[in-house]
């Protein structure tokens, strides 16, 4: 029905397109082209809070990276952390349905559009799906596919701007967390894949393939891959400043107004770095570089009383 050459030109999960979408990432990549953020940063994030990780990217102008209007499969406090595999879907129409199934067939893909994505997952992945908020007949995940996610990703899961089903079965799958919009018993129907590992959207957040997904509580943060190292180090600074600040307030050394300032004075930084070097609680922060903070303390606006975010 459709021109063979046209079908061959259309690609899903296209390595070169993914590389072009993520030019700021300079490190290793997966075979599909997604940025391969080192596992050590994902591991460090498990001990960090949402606000600690959100702050560094927000200050850089990435203000559309969080969505909180979601439900969680498990409410036991488990976090969802991994590398995004993105997919975008639209309501079905017969001609587009035929085209996209022909594209999938030409690439050797089996099953339905949601299965195509699950079949590509590797360890540490999180599937991030825009189902255009479709819940009735929009149940992207159920018991079988959640089991497949566990098998392929080990500790991954999903973020679905749409529905799920078989919740009782899904909850029996260990080490998986899923964020979703609603539950419905209907199987998935009447949808078409628009894009696979391209730009997608989860509510108010924009997501690229390879972004780091950080789900905590009822919300999800999508961290650009090229900022992860800086974000983790910035979050560590926020964490140790909080630990030090709480103690200084309790001891009456500084006021809350002083601790909450965006820019600390040299005296405060001297006390902080000394505390890091001498207190056992500061041991894991001893490799952090505070030169930028000292530069702001010396050359910033002394009248700037803006509080930290």
What positions do the PLM features span?
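Short, solvent-exposed loop/turn segments at the edges of secondary structure
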Residues: 195, 215-216
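Short, isolated positions in well-ordered beta-strands
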Residues: 36-37, 207
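Basic/polar N-terminal segments that are highly enriched at the extreme N-terminus
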Residues: 1-19, 299-309
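Feature captures the catalytic cores and cofactor-binding loops of soluble hydro-lyases/lyases
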Residues: 43-209, 222-271, 276-309
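Structural motif
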Residues: 34, 218-220
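Buried hydrophobic positions in well-ordered alpha/beta secondary-structure cores of metabolic enzymes
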Residues: 33, 149, 211-213
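Short acidic, Pro/Gly- and aromatic-enriched capping/linker segments at domain boundaries
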Residues: 9-29, 40-42
